[in-house]
């Protein structure tokens, strides 16, 4: 491991020299690639430097303990050695995690599909609650969140389905743990007996595909146009600006109605279709690996109930890792970081174990 870390540090220094060259920015594509590689290695190098400095300090303290004759001084040095011995394995574990291979899709932007499941109107209202939760979390992260498509329910404020686009730094690597079935337990406003109802909403987080990822043949597509609904300008319900694309071989459908023109909606719908096909391709690759990374946390198995939101007890439970929080209002306001951090740690532990097998 230490040889690998030293090699990474040397690579980081080489990249730093290349980026400091005044001519480096002339080729913007190459410059961005080098800069990303440099940024990706920075955290590993900083952790390695801290590990190396701690190890050096420990060695020096041990030497000092051997040569020291003063009893009080020896006691101080021994206390320092004990502290450093405790710190070193923690730093080593951190380095092992940082050296784990990154998932290629983690740096991608995402498409989030939220669909009301069992529970009727309550499920539709909870789909809207989850939508706001993700929009606020994206805002906290400094990401850009955009609504691409929605299908309102009969109850005001609810969604049968809604699709979001989220752009930013390492969005998929952060949001992929949200894929699955989210269950809510609460008393509906229309419930006169005070009984708790259980509803469910499915969430699919898809890494956004690039044009080079998926080959789509024009003859495999069917294009339909229709009038957009909901809020809008003069074109609403007058001009067919909304676009629906069907991929005939798979039956996958994507639609967009939020852009102003039919051309813009067509481009966004094509991007969504590409993303859905890429997700299938990615899932097939993951299936072939069939290792511990296929745990529920990493795959976001959409047939599984991953989380329960219990309103009477103000409790959120993630069933994959037995995580429980009694901060339901804050979580619904987008404060998801504690849950996501816990899921990431569980994922990293599973992947480290897989590396040892």
Curated annotation (Swiss-Prot):
One Pfam family here: PCRF
Post-translational modifications reported in the UniProt record: Methylated by PrmC. Methylation increases the termination efficiency of RF1.
Location(s), subcellular: Cytoplasm
One function term, GO molecular function aspect: translation release factor activity, codon specific
SUPFAM superfamilies tied to this protein: Release factor
InterPro entries to which the protein is assigned, alphabetical: PCRF (IPR005139), Pep_chain_release_fac_I (IPR000352), Pep_chain_release_fac_I_sf (IPR045853), Prokaryotic/Mito_RF (IPR050057), RF-1 (IPR004373)
Modified residues (N5-methylglutamine): 234
Keyword Cytoplasm: yes
Keyword Protein biosynthesis part of the UniProt annotation: yes
Any one annotated GO CC term: cytoplasm
Keywords in alphabetical order: Cytoplasm, Methylation, Protein biosynthesis
Record-stated family: Belongs to the prokaryotic/mitochondrial release factor family.
Free-text function comment from the UniProt entry: Peptide chain release factor 1 directs the termination of translation in response to the peptide chain termination codons UAG and UAA.
The name this protein goes by in its record: Peptide chain release factor 1
Protein source organism: Pelodictyon phaeoclathratiforme (strain DSM 5477 / BU-1)
Phylogenetic classification of the source organism: Bacteria, Pseudomonadati, Chlorobiota, Chlorobiia, Chlorobiales
């Amino acid at each position: 491991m230490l040889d690998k870390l030293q090699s990474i540090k040397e690579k980081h220094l080489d990249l730093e020299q290349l980026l400091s060259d005044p001519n480096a920015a002339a080729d913007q594509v190459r410059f961005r690639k080098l800069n990303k590689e440099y940024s990706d290695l920075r955290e590993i190098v900083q952790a390695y430097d801290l590990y190396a400095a701690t190890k050096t300090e420990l060695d020096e303290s041990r030497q000092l303990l051997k040569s020291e004759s003063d009893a009080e001084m020896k006691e101080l040095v021994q206390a320092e050695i004990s502290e450093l011995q405790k710190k070193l394995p923690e730093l080593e574990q951190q380095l092992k995690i940082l050296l784990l291979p990154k998932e290629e899709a983690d740096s991608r932007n995402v498409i989030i599909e939220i669909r009301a499941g069992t529970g009727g109107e309550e499920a539709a209202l909870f789909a809207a609650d989850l939508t706001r939760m993700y929009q606020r979390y994206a805002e906290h992260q400094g990401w850009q969140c955009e609504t691409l498509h929605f299908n309102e329910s009969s109850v005001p404020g609810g969604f049968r389905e809604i699709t979001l686009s989220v752009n930013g730094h390492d969005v998929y690597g952060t949001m992929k743990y949200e894929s699955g079935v989210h269950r809510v337990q609460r008393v509906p406003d229309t419930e006169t007996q005070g009984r708790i109802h259980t509803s469910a909403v499915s969430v699919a987080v898809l890494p956004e595909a690039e044009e080079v990822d998926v080959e789509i043949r024009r003859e495999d597509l069917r294009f339909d146009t229709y009038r957009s609904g909901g809020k809008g300008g003069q074109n609403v319900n007058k001009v067919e600006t909304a676009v629906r694309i069907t991929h005939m071989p798979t039956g996958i459908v994507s639609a967009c109605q939020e852009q102003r023109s039919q051309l813009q909606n067509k481009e966004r719908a094509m991007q969504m279709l590409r993303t859905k096909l890429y997700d299938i391709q990615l899932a097939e690759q993951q299936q072939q690996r069939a290792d511990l990374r296929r745990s529920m946390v990493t795959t976001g198995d959409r047939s599984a109930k991953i989380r329960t939101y219990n309103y009477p007890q103000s409790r959120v439970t993630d069933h994959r890792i037995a995580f429980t929080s009694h901060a339901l209002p804050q979580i619904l306001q987008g404060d998801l970081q504690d849950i996501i951090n816990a899921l990431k740690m569980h994922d990293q532990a599973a992947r480290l174990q897989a590396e040892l097998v």
